[in-house]
């Protein structure tokens, strides 16, 4: 699970880098960087993020649910502990998106920073603090 979550995090960065490279001429400030490459939803021209999301879903289904390791969330400490088997991968994906958002805000010194609370799961629900 940790390996798949790590690969999803890397996919977020790769998609961001590809977008910045492809849209370099049109990105003139932080506002256009956010709207063009970060959304939400994040621009993913090669489908890297969706591919890793599918792999994470498959990993949960094959290695945990089919193996009888349920509830999956109870096996992992943290914010996803209470997630059902069906929503566990989505919860992990939201946590990864939150960490990516916080990291990209710092790494690119984005001002004003991207709202990570809406970036992680599309909802303003205090699930990702700055």
State where each predicted segment sits.
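Soluble, non-transmembrane alpha-helical interaction regions
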Residues: 1-130
